[in-house]
């Protein structure tokens, strides 16, 4: 196509036949002394003829002349040899030899064609075998995403590829953004902010480290996700980290007024190996309900009240911050797409695995006799009060025992006292 276009446009100018001498009067007078009585006829080659001449197949004489000129130009020694005369013009014998029809050539062509036809079944069989062996190479469609994969077996860490596949980089429209999230935004595409996945991975690892250390220190973690579809996500994360979960609407005052809202929730006192301890019924009945030591919120936009109560109670929080969310609401931000269930499942799975590692480390240390957490102040106060009460009870018991012994002494007289009272001959 390219050569044909070039020839059609430039063939007449580059490859057309040379003009006649009549077109150049000065040169004609210089080269010849003939007087022309009439002007030469105009050139008869049109555009079609010029294109035909340009793309016409060269004759045998033209080819021989071209080869002779090339050899003479490039090899001067060959031009002086007798063999160079053979290239000056083709002989009649050579022309007849080329143009003579040879029946043997037809027989060879037919034999080759017959061999090719006979080889078709074998080639087709080989093609089928090769196709069966290589049909799964490079073209197999593999199931890369299973909706339950982050619930059944959550990963311990999230790579940039995992975050990209989970659409964690997709933000909101540029008109809905919060300027405080400018440090987390990578750029804009089609009117949507793109979150930097490198920043997301860094903040996610930091939050996972916080969850692991809180679990290692025996803290109580609360996973919150109140959007539709987040229920199995928070439940699975809480199971891994041995934490609490909330997938319904947050009741205002659950932290700041927990005496009234959580007064009837049963509690259990355990030792360093998570074995229940008895004898704390009075304390559990009188003590204040528990508050979480760390809150992980998957949708901070709908749980502003929860985050505000956590700030009042000085409880650290971890939240997924989208481009339209205020990052100052939480203590540890994870910039990501909070509208994608796949992204929230990936992030909560990583945090759940971190809590699982922390719990495992705590139990291993407890088996070695190392306690990684401190007894709460209220429980410690109950211990001190119970010890004081026990000491007071023992002191009173000792006093009572001494009084009883004195009474017994006063009731029963000794033998010497009886002799002194009744004389030496007194007998009992």
Swiss-Prot record:
Would you name any one GO CC term?
Answer: mitochondrial small ribosomal subunit
Q: Where is it localised?
A: Mitochondrion
Any Pfam family matching the protein: Ribosomal_S2
Span list, region Disordered: 30-50
* Any one GO molecular function term: structural constituent of ribosome
- Keywords, sorted A to Z: Mitochondrion, Ribonucleoprotein, Ribosomal protein
Q: Which domain of life is it from?
A: Eukaryota
| Principal cellular location given in the protein's record | mitochondrion
Q: Which GO terms describe its biological process?
A: translation
The record, for InterPro entries, names:
Ribosomal_uS2, Ribosomal_uS2_bac/mit/plastid, Ribosomal_uS2_CS, Ribosomal_uS2_flav_dom_sf
- Which PANTHER family has this protein been placed in? 30S RIBOSOMAL PROTEIN S2 PROKARYOTIC AND ORGANELLAR, SMALL RIBOSOMAL SUBUNIT PROTEIN US2M
Quaternary state and interactors: Component of the mitochondrial small ribosomal subunit (mt-SSU). Mature N.crassa 74S mitochondrial ribosomes consist of a small (37S) and a large (54S) subunit. The 37S small subunit contains a 16S ribosomal RNA (16S mt-rRNA) and 32 different proteins. The 54S large subunit contains a 23S rRNA (23S mt-rRNA) and 42 different proteins.
Q: Which family does it belong to?
A: Belongs to the universal ribosomal protein uS2 family.
Q: What does this protein do?
A: Component of the mitochondrial ribosome (mitoribosome), a dedicated translation machinery responsible for the synthesis of mitochondrial genome-encoded proteins, including at least some of the essential transmembrane subunits of the mitochondrial respiratory chain. The mitoribosomes are attached to the mitochondrial inner membrane and translation products are cotranslationally integrated into the membrane.
Task: Write the protein's name.
Answer: Small ribosomal subunit protein uS2m
What organism is this sequence from? Answer: Neurospora crassa (strain ATCC 24698 / 74-OR23-1A / CBS 708.71 / DSM 1257 / FGSC 987)
Q: Which gene encodes it?
A: mrp4
């Amino acid at each position: 196509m390219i050569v044909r276009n070039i020839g059609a446009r430039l063939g007449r100018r580059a490859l057309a036949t040379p003009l006649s001498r009549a077109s150049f009067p000065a040169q004609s007078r210089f080269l010849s002394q003939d007087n022309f009585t009439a002007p030469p006829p105009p050139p008869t080659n049109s555009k079609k003829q010029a294109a035909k001449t340009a793309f016409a197949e060269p004759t045998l004489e033209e080819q021989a002349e071209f080869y002779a000129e090339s050899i003479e130009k490039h090899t001067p020694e060959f031009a002086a040899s007798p063999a160079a005369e053979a290239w000056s013009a083709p002989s009649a014998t050579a022309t007849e030899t080329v143009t003579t029809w040879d029946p043997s050539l037809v027989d060879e062509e037919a034999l080759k064609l017959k061999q090719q036809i006979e080889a078709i079944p074998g080639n087709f069989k080989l093609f089928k075998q090769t196709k069966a062996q290589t049909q799964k190479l490079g073209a197999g469609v593999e199931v890369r995403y299973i909706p339950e994969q982050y619930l059944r077996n959550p990963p311990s860490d999230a790579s940039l590829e995992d975050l990209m596949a989970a659409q964690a980089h997709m933000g909101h429209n540029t008109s809905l953004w919060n300027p405080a999230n400018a440090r987390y935004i990578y750029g804009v595409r089609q009117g949507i902010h793109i979150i930097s996945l490198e920043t997301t991975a860094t903040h996610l690892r930091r939050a996972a480290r916080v969850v692991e250390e809180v679990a290692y220190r025996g803290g109580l973690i609360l996973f919150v996700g109140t959007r539709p579809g987040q229920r199995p996500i928070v439940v699975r994360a809480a199971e891994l980290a041995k934490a609490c979960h909330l997938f319904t609407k947050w009741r205002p005052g659950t932290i700041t007024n927990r005496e009234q809202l959580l007064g009837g929730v049963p509690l259990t006192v355990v030792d360093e190996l998570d074995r229940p301890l008895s004898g704390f019924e009075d304390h559990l009945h009188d003590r204040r309900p528990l508050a979480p030591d760390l809150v992980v919120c998957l949708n901070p936009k709908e749980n502003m009240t929860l985050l505000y109560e956590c700030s009042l109670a000085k409880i650290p929080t971890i939240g997924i911050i989208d481009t339209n969310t205020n990052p100052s609401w939480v203590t540890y931000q994870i910039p990501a797409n909070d509208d994608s269930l796949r992204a929230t499942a990936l992030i909560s799975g990583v945090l759940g695995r971190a809590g699982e590692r922390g719990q495992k480390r705590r139990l291993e240390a407890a088996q070695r006799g190392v306690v990684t957490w401190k007894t709460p102040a209220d429980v410690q106060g109950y211990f001190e009060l119970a010890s004081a009460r026990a000491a007071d009870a023992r002191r009173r018991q000792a006093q009572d025992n001494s009084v009883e012994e004195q009474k017994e002494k006063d009731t029963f007289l000794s033998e010497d006292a009886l002799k002194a009272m009744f004389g030496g001959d007194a007998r009992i």
